[in-house]
């Protein structure tokens, strides 16, 4: 459908718009009520899933194109389904009409990390794969904030009652924190990105610290990507601040023994969550909100780019 027009479309590309698809840069920020020595985080969409429907004609066209295209590896091929990886395994594609009809859902899915695609690869994917789909939309968006700071020194909590899981590193400090469960509409991960890169890819990060706050949004929550973590707090509470020794002791216990929260009644949980917020001079989520606000238009352009009606060359 679009594969012969790739070069022509590329010539019309407004490079400054696509360049703005890159992650946001670092800068120092000061917010009212919070004195930040932490640099502004680098912000990006780190994962996307787009689903849509292939009609019979487009399914045949796409299958024919994919079977001869050298940048695509196909398997599990039948008349009503196929699986594929494209662009050096950076994109996963799945089509299954029978399963979609029986489960009453859309029949094609495309998964990728836009940070790993070049501008040319983005155009190729949109024009040769995604534009074949009808009734397409996002079912997953991952919003990633990368901090050049040691977030193990911070205390993370949510106002909502969600499951919290913590994994500790060899030094005894928190290395990964999960809020929620993986199959929920929102799943928050806070982890040591520098250590993760070293462990998984043996890649050495030059920064002294690199931590990521990643918010995985699915299904209906993708529509709220620009307002999805109001209940999250990443704090540096000073447990010695409360005047009452009993409150000091309780706050210290809650900060250092996560299991203690489960022993509190509902009103006590609310009281101490409020107190912990009050005794923290810093809440990094305020920095995250300001970063998101500053970059909201460019992030929206990324979303618009993948939608059928959007064209850079207009």
UniProtKB/Swiss-Prot annotation:
GO BP term, pick one: DNA replication
InterPro entries attached to this UniProt entry: REP-like_C, RepD-like_N
Recorded superkingdom: Bacteria
Keyword annotations: DNA replication, Plasmid
Known function: This protein is probably a specific topoisomerase involved in initiating replication. This protein is specifically required and may be rate-limiting for replication of the plasmid in vivo.
UniProt family annotation: Belongs to the plasmid replication initiation factor family.
Other facts: The nicking site of REP proteins is sequence, but not plasmid, specific. It appears that the REP protein of pTZ12 is a fusion protein of pT181 RepC and pC221 RepD proteins, formed spontaneously by a recombination event between a pT181-like plasmid and a pC221-like plasmid.
Protein name, per record: Replication initiation protein
Taxon lineage: Bacteria, Bacillati, Bacillota, Bacilli, Bacillales
Gene (name only): rep
């Amino acid at each position: 459908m679009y594969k012969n027009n790739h070069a022509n479309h590329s010539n019309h590309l407004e490079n400054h718009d696509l360049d703005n698809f890159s992650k946001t840069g670092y800068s120092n920020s000061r917010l009212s009520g919070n004195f930040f020595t932490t640099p502004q985080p680098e912000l990006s969409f780190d994962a996307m899933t787009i689903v849509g429907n292939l009609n019979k004609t487009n399914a045949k066209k796409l299958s024919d194109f994919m079977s001869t295209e050298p940048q695509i590896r196909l398997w599990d091929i039948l008349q009503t389904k196929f699986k594929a990886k494209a662009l050096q395994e950076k994109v996963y594609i799945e089509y299954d009409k029978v399963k979609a009809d029986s489960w009453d859902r859309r029949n094609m899915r495309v998964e990728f990390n836009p940070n790993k695609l070049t501008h040319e690869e983005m155009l190729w994917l949109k024009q040769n794969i995604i534009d074949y789909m009808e009734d397409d939309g996002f079912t997953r968006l991952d919003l990633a904030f990368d901090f050049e700071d040691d977030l193990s020194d911070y205390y993370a909590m949510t106002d909502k009652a969600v499951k919290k899981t913590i994994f500790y590193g060899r030094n005894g400090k928190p290395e990964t924190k999960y809020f929620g469960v993986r199959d929920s509409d929102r799943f928050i991960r806070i982890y040591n990105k520098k250590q993760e890169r070293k462990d998984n890819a043996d890649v050495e990060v030059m920064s002294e610290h690199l931590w990521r706050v990643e918010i995985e949004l699915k299904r209906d929550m993708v529509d709220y990507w620009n307002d999805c973590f109001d209940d999250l707090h990443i704090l540096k509470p000073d447990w010695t601040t409360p005047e009452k020794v009993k409150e000091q002791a309780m706050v210290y216990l809650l900060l250092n023994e996560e299991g203690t929260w489960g022993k509190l009644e509902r009103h006590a949980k609310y009281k101490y969550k409020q107190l912990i917020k009050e005794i923290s001079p810093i809440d990094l989520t305020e920095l995250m909100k300001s970063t998101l606000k500053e970059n909201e238009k460019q992030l929206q352009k990324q979303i618009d780019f993948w939608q059928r009606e959007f064209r850079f060359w207009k």
